[in-house]
Design a protein with these regions (language model features):
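N-terminal localization/anchoring segments of enzymes in phospholipid and broader phosphate metabolism
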Residues: 1-351
């Protein structure tokens, strides 16, 4: 299951030092043979499970990189191994858009620029080398090849990548805390529309203890309410399967004016935001990307409605992203109000 997926590399004059991917795991070994020392590297493939469960009742497991490390003598059987360890490289994630040359073509929009820039991220300079276990020769060689100094190298006794822990639920669910379910505020009625309840009084939600559902319900009502004229919103981070974005798409498809400022430079969420920006545009939303040189961190949603010839506003402001998943994890506040002065202020912002 493992060996056929491995691609061992020996670094010599005919085989230059490979590109070590950001936060990938590698098994490294110093090899001796024919009066010379060489570096051998084996990448731990992402396609392999991070742990292998062992038979028995005690939920025992072994990490996949440990299995590969234990078999390096068979993988490099023509050589004698003097040192071996697991290594991982962290690369710079800060993209300098000017230096990346993504503003060269003024005919392209920011979304195209960001798509180009993200392709460059995986090739940015290393900023950290982590080693599980000290191996002085491997350390010296990797620091030289990666152009790192000793202060950028960390010798660890623990696993370098801890994502494997997410797989432990398959081994023993008793390891987990009891799951907490955010509650729907008892002062709100699930059976009645949320809009008139907001008109009666301000509603303040406290995540993650209270549910995001009242706000999602507000968006759903606005998307389908014939009296709603427009929805304007700023977005920094969205869930992968975002109900917020889907409600905005529905609103646009129902003929409402929907304007969304999508921050494409939300670090590590750039690709997700690019894809949602495309989907919002295809649904008929007007998507803008903010001001060059600035990031938009504000969380504001303005819904404009006409009833009996009068304009009404519902304004939502918050400290947290419009992300249903993280709203169950992070402490944030969400205020929904019908106060006209806040609605007028938000309208000025979006203009």
């Amino acid at each position: 299951r493992i060996f056929p997926l491995l691609s061992p590399q020996i670094i010599d004059r005919s085989h230059p030092f490979p590109h070590l991917k950001n936060k990938a795991l590698y098994a490294a070994a110093m090899l001796t043979g024919q009066d010379r020392s060489l570096l051998g590297i084996v990448e731990v493939p992402d396609s392999l499970p991070p742990i292998i469960l062992l038979p028995g009742e005690n939920a025992q497991y072994v990490r996949t990189e440990e299995v590969i490390l234990s078999q390096l003598r068979k993988i490099f059987k023509a050589y004698h191994i003097t040192e071996q360890c697991i290594v991982s490289v962290t690369r710079n994630a800060d993209i300098n858009y000017a230096e990346a040359g993504i503003y060269d073509d003024e005919s392209e929009d920011l979304r195209d620029y960001m798509t180009k820039a993200l392709r460059k991220r995986g090739r940015l300079a290393p900023v950290r080398l982590e080693m599980q276990g000290d191996a002085p020769e491997i350390r010296k060689l990797l620091e030289q090849k990666l152009k790192l100094d000793s202060q950028q190298t960390y010798i660890c006794s623990c696993p370098l990548i801890l994502k494997y822990a997410y797989q432990l639920d398959k081994a023993d669910r008793s390891l987990y805390y009891t799951e907490y379910t955010p509650v729907y505020p008892d002062y709100l009625s699930k059976e009645h529309p949320i809009w008139p309840q907001i008109q009666q009084r301000d509603i303040l939600l406290f995540y993650p203890y209270q549910s995001m559902q009242p706000f999602l319900g507000l968006l759903r009502e606005a998307a389908n309410d014939p009296q709603v004229l427009s929805i304007q919103m700023t977005i920094y981070r969205l869930a992968g399967n975002s109900a917020v974005a889907k409600h905005l798409c529905t609103a646009a498809e129902n003929g409402k004016s929907v304007t969304v400022l999508v921050e494409l430079r939300a670090r590590f969420d750039e690709e997700n935001n690019i894809e949602w920006a495309k989907e919002l545009e295809e649904a008929g939303c007007r998507v803008v990307y903010g001001i060059e040189g600035y990031k938009c961190h504000s969380k504001i949603c303005l819904i404009t409605r006409r009833e009996r010839g009068k304009i009404q506003y519902i304004t939502q402001v918050g400290t947290g992203n419009y992300n249903e998943k993280t709203a169950k994890q992070y402490t944030d506040l969400c205020l929904m109000t019908a106060r006209p002065e806040l609605g007028e202020d938000a309208a000025v912002l979006f203009r």
